[in-house]
Amino acid sequence: VTVESEHFAKYDEQHIVCLSYRITTDFHADLEIVTGIDGDVWDIHGPHYIRLSGARNETRLSMEAETGTGDRVAVVSQIQLDFPCEKKDKEQEKRLLDRYCMVTNANEPISLTKLTAIYTTKDAKAPLEEAGKALEAVVEKGYAQCRSEQQEAWEEAWKTAEVEIDGDDEAMEALNYSLYHLMSIAPRHTRGLSIGARGLSGQTYKGAVFWDTEMFMLDFFLYTDPAVAKTLLEYRIDTLG
């Protein structure tokens, strides 16, 4: 069995996440794919959400969760398939899942795409409604166009951000990989946010922002994306005192 996957959070549409799977078997096989929305999210201090509500229809899954501080997070997703299958609901506590059962033929790949929209009360008063609208737009656009837009957006970003080092390809790759993370977590979508000490990859500081941002990250954005540098400084000004 060969599984090829792509997944990306859109650089130019911060609420959209896209996934694609291509599965090929070299034998006649009964195959089951389970996918959905997992609300059973924990951090090192315990469950991340205190309340969950979910819904499903023929094409979509949706879930809204509430944190201990009263913020709400809404996720709406839709699966698109290019093969005949039997769809079954799969119930688990705190999870909304769909089960797709099919028969594959040898060396005939099948494809599945999943488009997801995510909103919070930091973005809108009614995050579930806004996530639904955003998903409608991205479904109409389709995975292929989203992928093309993602590629174009990153190519444009790298025109001003890429670092070239003569004679040390490993160092150049490592440095640009770090810059990729900086560009990925930059708060482009709103005024007065910053970058947490662990970025998007750790829980230890629960999103806390230290002076590390100004000491180690600000210069990069000053030269590559001044609007982000301004946002980082506005956050600091807004939170002084």
Briefly describe each language-model feature range:
Residues 1-205:
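Acidic/polar, glycine-enriched structural segments that form the non-catalytic walls/loops
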Residues 168-177, 214-241:
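Carboxylate/His-rich catalytic cores and anion/metal-binding grooves
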Residues 186, 191-221, 235, 241:
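Long, K/E/R/D-enriched contiguous segments that form extended
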